[in-house]
């Protein structure tokens, strides 16, 4: 039967070679309507993730975020997009590959550390995230989500005596 064929294919090594769409990320820089452009980018990428959507914008001084569970058209209204003022935006649509499907795991992730606000939108899986998370928790890190993407932010925060760029490079050397 067709069910048997599909089940056998999905268990075969060839199944891992087929393209799969897992999350969508877009970024806009130097545009006065960056949140609306990010919205349209996410709308076009929505086939890559229909669990949740989020946009972070910045004008270089303040950072604004709006994210929620649902389709892009359900998460954002014209009013919401108008309120997300800034010339820089990043957006994310999610299909969970790691972490539970709930509001806490929507992206972009946004943190403030040492007076610097950072937003991250990540597409993919970190192979060594469990080992890194365990190590970081043993050293006092407190995680807010179950996503592996949050590990990168904690690694960066540990490089307290480094510049942003150096902290990012150090964290990337540790992840796989």
Residue ranges and their predicted role:
Residues 1-176:
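Conserved short alpha-helical segments that host acidic/polar catalytic motifs at enzyme active sites
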